[in-house]
Amino acid sequence: MVGITLDEMKAVGALLDGHFKLSSGRHSSRYLQCALYLADPARAEAAGRQLAARLRSAAAQLVVSPALGGVIIGHEVARALEDVRFFFTERADGAMTLRRGFQIEPGVRALVVEDVITTGGSTREVMEVVTAAGGNVVGVGAIVNRSGEENPFAPLPFAALLTIDVPNYEAAACPLCAEGVPLVKPGSRV
C-alpha cells in the first residue's frame, strides 16, 4: 500500500460530509476523523510504517505528537523507525506542553507527527515545545495534509499519506453558516 485514499477513508466512515468546526477554529464541509481510520491496529501499524519510510532519512531519535489526534500515528511511526522514543504534548491552561514526566534531551533529533494538518497551528505549537526544550525538529509527518501547501513546514522535510483540497473558512465568511447548516465540533478541541 502506498499512501491512503479517500475511498479507504470513506469505507471506514472516517470521511464525513456536513458542516464542521475544525481544531483551528475554521469551518469546512468535510472532516477527516482519523481515529476511525486508525481504530484497526493493523491499519494503524501500516500507516505508521509508510510514514516512517518517508521520513526515515531525517534520522530522528524521538517522535513527538499532539494529543489527542496525533498519539496513535506518532506512536506507530516511532515503532516503525525502531530505537526511537515517542512523547506526546497536551494542552494545559490553553498552552501546548510536555507532561507525564516527558523530558526532551538537548540536541535530540525530533520528528513531529500529526493526524491532520489544516493550518498547521497545533503542529507548530509542538515544534515550539520541542525547540524550547533544546530539541531539534528534523521533519514533520501527517496522515492527511489539507493545508493547500505541498510542504507547509518548508524547509523541513514533510510527508503526508493523503493530500486533499477541501476549502475551509473563517467563521464569519463560512457559506455553510450563511445557509444555516448546523455546525458540528467533532475534534479534540471543542
Spans of model-derived segments:
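PRPP-associated nucleotide enzymes
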Residues: 1-190
